[in-house]
């Protein structure tokens, strides 16, 4: 396609004009010039050609255009007419009415005139050139001669600077491809000029142009064939010879540096074209264009039309190497982009490449508009990582500092926004932002009075604060300025960002020290505030309490919505409080200054942390609790003292009930640290608090938090009223830690008894580690086991284990340690003395016959005691008759816990007495379980029946080999009951999994006892003891009275120094008789052998039938009471001989009820307020009722925890089996959780804790659970009126006194009542026994429910949900067969 252009000088007017020769020019003549263009060419190419054609701007010309398009001439003409008319519609241009566009059909017309380059001299050389009329080939050749003769021409084709684009060269090559024709060579002369436009003679030897065809499949036709002559005089000659038509891309490089940022896409057309001899652009043309652009930019009405001229050309001129032209065009461009729409168009059309080109210029920063453009562009592109990476690598950070110091506010604001975004989204780029120049810029930006700029600057500092240190002077200067600005700023939003920075600074020890020395503490806790109240904007706790009581339908949805709205309103305030608390906690961690710890342990610092505790935001509370944990771990003991004296313990404990999982570790560790400093600081904790710790202990038993919880409970266990609750609730996990603490010397649970207070009479035994002596302590019969540390058989580890277990366990069938001493050189244990000695003494003495009924009674008590141990995860590991002590009433007490340990994954090999060792223990296995004690129990039962020593006829090495290889067992006597035979057989089976649990054994023996009772072998005597009469195995004939009936003779809480009782009841320590048969001996390296004195052998009077008042179950046993100061409720089972109103201390004051505030916070689920535990911040006092559940107490292990707190007088004790049917278990307590049935768990299968846990849940302390707290620390005068008065109701102590009066008024009446109760219970047992067996066939165990379910209904109604789950024992196939056989019998 060719455009026919007819141009007339603007100087000519009218219908015609004279030329320089006076000839009139006829517009209809052939004075026309042809311009060949292609439809794909953009408008800027047409404009550039027009300028090149006529050497002067078209404003001075009349233009007549004819478009020749053989395919679609009309539409093509219309399109070009529109483009050119829009180009010429400028007020400075004269639009002539005679301007026309005509369509001319030229068939195969070949133009005879061709364009030649202008003269390479001055801009006025056009006047010397002939007019463009009647141009022909000859005139073209004449022009070549003229040009060749004009030396020193100034031409510009290509910039000499590497890396710059050259639009002229791109256009030249592209136009050459347009004109190219197959078989015709197209030549381009390439000139190189300097920045002044002067010709460079020495052309680079590494000039490369590649023309590649796009989307070509064939390799041969991808690259266009052309020849390239590298060097010829003052130019380089490129010869192109197109072969295949299509789209090509151009790549132009000089010294391997691309000069064309974007390849020029073009299409070759098949059209004849003669050789183009020369193509170049002159400097005169550039000057004329600048003149035209300047003319257009001078008037506001025409400056927008510069886009009509083409922004591409304008931008090309901006990068022209002539500095004068460059500065001029940059100024015009800056004026052009004052309007935002023009900025958008530039960035939209040219993208981020334009920014990089612009900042590469030398003088762009002199123009404010360009600064604004770059600043706004940086703000827009700050989230685009590719741009950021390229910007920092190619441009650098100094541009930011340059723009930020501009006078126009938009520039520093945009820079602040840019820095804040970059510091937030790209941590990798922070290395560029921590330079000294940026920090100086940040300091400058902080001084600007613009909120957006300051906020973004503070945000940048907070994001970069983790990268700061004191090694650079700029960091110190920035911190100093930040501290000064913090004093001036009052807006919460600014304080949020400042303290966010401070919180990060305080992580670094040097920065933290600098901030402290420069007054940050005065910003956190003002010294002038003497009231301790801080105006911290927090949505505090009482806000939520108020809404709970105001809203009538305070359902969960309303409360959550309320909290959500408050969070939105106080978002900035909440953030401020959080970063303030984070700054304090980080400061406490980083600094080694004890002064800082002391600052926040008292005074305003402590008051501030207390306020954080009651903040609604979880993160704030967490940081406050973290601060308390750090202070409590400070080497400065004064800090811990201040915390305790300030009453922080109640706040921490009460917060546990509402704390989230992230807060709990800080609270627990704080309490543990304070306990290490002062063990008495947690003495005021109540039952609810202890239950909460036990719940946390088992929530995640594998966490490190369990050790801290156990440490706290270990200090509380020294209180007799909590001991049984903690042991039963904590289970084996707690006992493991407790024993570890004792062994390490961190805790001592052994109550110290001075040796001067002991009256030792005679030696009753001697062993390899010490002696056992009988004596008295405050008038009570005791046995003292003295250890000789120099003996080889002594083991301090075993001493601590035995002392700990015997001190903390509370059960009617477990020997209790009253106290003793663990001091080196004076190590002894003081225990109850039992006059009948050990079961081994009874068996070997052959003085008192052991009837079947008595054996059932003894075996049942051993099983119950062992079941209690197993429920706590304890393996005795040395169960034998020598370790089973018998009191005057034939009650069994298990002793000698030196070898006992809590179940672990790995156990000690071969521990215990060999003949009682289980098969797996003899094999040396370390993974044996509690079933090893069941194996030992079988031999205890066998020894009671046979009254012989196991394997007495064999050497030890012989019978061990027979046991391991041939499963040999001692022969069971023929006179043995079938029930005993079957039980022994199952208990000593080689496979531990086939052995029953002690809970199953208890059930079995209970049913056997009932069967004997139905057959007349057993009867209940008036004294409340079950003995055998007549027929098989008579235990003894009761006289109907209970002349020698024994209760505990040592009461911990009632001994006052007077001894009014000379009871014949004695207490006994572990007596391991020495026997020449080694089968009775334990392993030498681990077991103590105690030699019993001949003077202390049992006599016939000891086995007198008249003194036999044996109970049918441990729940009716008379347990000896513990001495004064013991930590065990041994005397809880009955009234002490000296327990009366005169000896018992009375309380003439009332315990005040706790004033507490409920904590319902928006970031936590809203619990049911009625069922929620009272926390430390309840604003309505709710009395805590103490329910007397003694009449419904059915625990076989815990019978009334403490006489001082429970009424024991008329307790009806019933036997209750914890292995119940689903219906019965549902009746026990609502909400009982399922148990973890692991064998090594303290809630393991077969070791149900129903009795213990029901006792734990029923027993309630007489003191209010928790603490009596002061009002919240914020504005005490305001909240003082909200504290309710103390409730003046009678305390549980009064009831206890009354109960004790009843206990001591008439013992005979009590005995009669007990007789009646027992008779009634046994009648019920007889009625229900068969039903119990039939209802539990699926369990394979005969279970006796007795009256326990009915008796416990009231107890369940008065007791909260059971905290510790009841585990169901496993079904045993061998037991099922045994039960079937038992039913048939």
Curated annotation (Swiss-Prot):
The protein's name: Probable serine/threonine-protein kinase DDB_G0268876
Ranges for domain Protein kinase: 758-1008
GO cellular component terms, semicolon-separated: cytoplasm
PROSITE patterns: PROTEIN_KINASE_ATP (PS00107), PROTEIN_KINASE_DOM (PS50011), PROTEIN_KINASE_ST (PS00108)
EC supergroup of this enzyme: transferase
Active site: 878
Keywords, alphabetical: ATP-binding, Kinase, Nucleotide-binding, Serine/threonine-protein kinase, Transferase
Organism whose genome encodes this protein: Dictyostelium discoideum (Social amoeba)
GO biological process, one term: signal transduction
EC numbers on record: 2.7.11.1
């Amino acid at each position: 396609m060719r455009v026919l252009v007819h141009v007339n000088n603007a100087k000519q007017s009218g219908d015609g004009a004279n030329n320089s020769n006076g000839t009139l020019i006829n517009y209809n003549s052939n004075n026309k010039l042809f311009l060949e263009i292609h439809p794909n060419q953009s408008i800027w190419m047409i404009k550039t050609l027009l300028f090149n054609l006529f050497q002067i701007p078209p404003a001075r010309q009349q233009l007549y255009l004819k478009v020749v398009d053989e395919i679609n001439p009309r539409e093509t003409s219309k399109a070009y007419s529109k483009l050119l008319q829009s180009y010429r519609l400028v007020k400075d241009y004269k639009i002539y009415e005679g301007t026309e566009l005509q369509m001319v059909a030229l068939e195969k017309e070949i133009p005879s005139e061709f364009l030649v380059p202008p003269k390479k001299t001055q801009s006025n050389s056009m006047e010397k050139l002939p007019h463009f009329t009647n141009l022909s080939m000859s005139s073209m050749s004449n022009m070549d001669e003229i040009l060749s003769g004009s030396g020193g021409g100034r031409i510009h084709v290509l910039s000499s600077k590497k890396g710059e684009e050259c639009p002229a060269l791109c256009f030249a090559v592209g136009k050459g491809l347009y004109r190219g024709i197959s078989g015709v060579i197209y030549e381009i002369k390439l000139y190189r000029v300097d920045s002044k436009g002067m010709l460079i003679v020495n052309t680079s030897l590494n000039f490369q142009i590649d023309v590649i065809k796009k989307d070509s499949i064939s390799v041969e036709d991808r690259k266009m064939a052309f020849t390239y002559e590298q060097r010829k005089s003052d130019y380089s000659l490129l010869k192109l010879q197109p072969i295949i038509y299509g789209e090509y891309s151009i790549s132009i490089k000089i010294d391997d540096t691309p000069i064309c940022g974007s390849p020029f896409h073009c299409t070759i057309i098949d059209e004849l074209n003669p050789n183009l001899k020369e193509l170049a652009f002159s400097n005169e043309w550039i000057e004329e264009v600048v003149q035209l652009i300047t003319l257009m930019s001078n008037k506001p009405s025409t400056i927008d039309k510069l886009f009509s001229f083409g922004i591409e050309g304008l931008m090309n001129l901006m990068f022209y190497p002539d500095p004068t032209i460059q500065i001029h065009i940059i100024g015009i461009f800056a004026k052009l982009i004052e309007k935002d729409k023009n900025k958008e168009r530039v960035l939209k059309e040219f993208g981020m490449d334009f920014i990089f080109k612009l900042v590469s210029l030398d003088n762009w920063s002199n123009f404010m508009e360009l600064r604004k453009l770059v600043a706004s562009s940086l703000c827009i592109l700050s989230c685009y990582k590719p741009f950021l990476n390229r910007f920092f690598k190619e441009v650098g950070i100094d541009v930011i500092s340059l723009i930020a110091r501009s006078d126009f506010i938009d520039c520093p604001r945009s820079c602040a926004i840019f820095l804040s975004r970059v510091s937030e989204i790209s941590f990798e780029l922070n290395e560029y932002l921590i330079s000294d120049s940026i920090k100086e810029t940040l300091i400058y930006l902080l001084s600007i009075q613009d909120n957006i700029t300051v906020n973004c600057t503070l945000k940048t500092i907070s994001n970069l604060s983790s990268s700061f240190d004191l090694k650079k002077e700029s960091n110190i200067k920035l911190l100093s300025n930040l501290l000064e600005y913090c004093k001036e700023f009052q807006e919460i939003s600014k304080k949020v960002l400042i303290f966010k920075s401070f919180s990060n600074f305080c992580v670094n020890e040097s920065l933290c020290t600098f901030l402290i020395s420069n007054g940050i503490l005065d910003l956190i806790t003002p010294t002038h505030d003497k009231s301790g109240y801080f105006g911290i904007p927090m949505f505090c706790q009482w806000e939520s309490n108020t809404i709970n009581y105001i809203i009538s339908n305070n359902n969960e949805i309303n409360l959550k919505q309320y909290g959500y709205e408050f969070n939105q309103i106080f978002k900035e305030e909440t953030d401020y409080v959080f970063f303030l608390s984070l700054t304090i906690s980080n400061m406490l961690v980083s600094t080694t200054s004890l002064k800082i710890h002391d600052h926040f342990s008292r005074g305003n610092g402590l008051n501030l942390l207390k306020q954080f505790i009651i903040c609604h935001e979880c993160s704030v509370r967490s940081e406050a609790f973290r601060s308390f944990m750090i202070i409590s771990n400070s080497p400065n003991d004064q800090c811990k003292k201040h915390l305790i004296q300030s009453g922080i313990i109640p706040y921490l404990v009460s917060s546990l009930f509402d704390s989230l999982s992230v807060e709990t570790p800080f609270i627990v560790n704080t309490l543990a640290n304070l306990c290490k400093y002062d063990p008495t600081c947690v003495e005021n904790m109540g039952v609810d608090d202890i239950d909460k710790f036990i719940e946390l202990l088992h929530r995640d038993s594998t966490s490190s938090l369990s050790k801290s919880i156990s440490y706290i409970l270990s200090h509380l266990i020294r209180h007799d009223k909590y001991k049984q609750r903690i042991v039963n609730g904590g289970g084996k996990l707690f006992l493991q830690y407790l024993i570890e603490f004792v062994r390490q010397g961190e805790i001592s649970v052994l109550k110290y008894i001075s040796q001067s207070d002991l009256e030792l009479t005679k030696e009753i035994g001697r062993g390899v580690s010490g002696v056992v002596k009988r004596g008295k302590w405050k008038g009570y019969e005791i046995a003292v086991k003295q250890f000789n540390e120099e003996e080889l058989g002594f083991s301090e580890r075993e001493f601590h284990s035995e002392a700990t277990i015997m001190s903390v366990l509370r059960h009617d069938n477990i020997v209790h340690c009253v106290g003793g001493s663990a001091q080196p050189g004076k190590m002894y244990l003081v225990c109850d003395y039992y006059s009948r000695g050990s079961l081994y003494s009874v068996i070997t003495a052959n003085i008192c016959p052991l009837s079947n009924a008595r054996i059932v009674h003894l075996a049942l008590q051993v099983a119950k005691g062992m079941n209690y141990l197993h429920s706590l995860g304890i393996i005795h590991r040395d169960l034998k008759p020598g370790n089973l002590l018998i009191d005057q009433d034939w009650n069994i007490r298990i002793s000698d816990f030196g070898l006992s340990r809590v179940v672990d994954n790995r156990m000690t090999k071969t521990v215990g007495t060999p003949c009682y060792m289980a098969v797996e223990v003899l094999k040396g296995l370390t993974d044996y379980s509690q079933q090893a004690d069941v194996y030992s129990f079988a031999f205890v039962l066998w020894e009671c029946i046979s009254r012989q020593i196991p394997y007495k006829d064999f050497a030890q090495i012989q019978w061990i080999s027979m046991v391991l290889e041939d499963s040999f067992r001692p022969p069971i006597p023929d006179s043995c009951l079938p029930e005993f035979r079957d039980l022994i057989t199952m208990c000593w089976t080689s496979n531990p999994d086939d052995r029953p649990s002690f809970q199953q054994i208890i059930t079995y023996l209970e049913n056997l006892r009932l069967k004997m009772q139905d057959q007349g072998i057993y009867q209940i005597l008036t004294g409340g003891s079950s003995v055998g009469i007549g027929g098989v195995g008579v235990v003894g004939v009761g006289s109907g009275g209970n002349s020698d009936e024994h209760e505990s003779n040592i009461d911990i809480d009632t001994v006052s120094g007077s001894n009014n009782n000379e009871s014949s009841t004695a207490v006994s320590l572990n007596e391991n008789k020495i026997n020449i048969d080694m089968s009775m001996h334990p392993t030498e390296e681990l077991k103590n052998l105690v030699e019993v004195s001949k003077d202390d052998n049992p006599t016939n009077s000891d086995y007198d039938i008249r003194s036999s008042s044996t109970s049918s179950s441990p729940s009716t046993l008379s347990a000896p009471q513990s001495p004064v100061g013991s930590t065990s409720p041994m005397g809880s089972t009955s009234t002490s001989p000296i327990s009366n109103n005169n000896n018992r201390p009375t309380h003439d004051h009332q315990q005040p009820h706790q004033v507490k505030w409920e904590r319902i916070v928006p970031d936590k689920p809203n619990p049911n307020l009625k069922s929620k535990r009272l926390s430390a911040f309840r604003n309505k006092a709710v009395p805590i009722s103490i329910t007397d559940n003694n009449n419904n107490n059915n625990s076989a292990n815990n019978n009334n925890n403490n006489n001082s707190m429970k009424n024991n007088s008329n307790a009806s004790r019933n036997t209750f089996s914890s292995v119940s049917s689903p219906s019965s278990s549902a009746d026990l307590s609502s909400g009982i959780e399922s148990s973890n049935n692991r064998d090594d768990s303290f809630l393991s299968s077969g070791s149900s804790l129903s009795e213990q846990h029901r006792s734990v849940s029923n027993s309630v302390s007489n003191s209010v659970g928790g603490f009596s707290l002061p009002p919240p620390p914020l504005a005490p005068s305001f909240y003082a009126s909200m504290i309710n008065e103390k409730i003046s109701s009678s305390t549980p102590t009064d009831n206890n006194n009354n109960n004790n009066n009843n206990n001591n008024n008439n013992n005979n009446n009590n005995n009669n009542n007990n007789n009646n109760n027992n008779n009634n219970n046994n009648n019920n047992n007889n009625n229900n026994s068969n039903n119990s067996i039939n209802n539990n066939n699926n369990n394979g165990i005969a279970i006796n429910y007795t009256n326990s379910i009915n008796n416990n209904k009231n107890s369940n109604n008065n007791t909260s949900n059971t905290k510790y789950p009841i585990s169901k024992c496993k079904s045993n196939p061998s037991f099922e067969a045994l039960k079937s056989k038992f039913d048939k019998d």
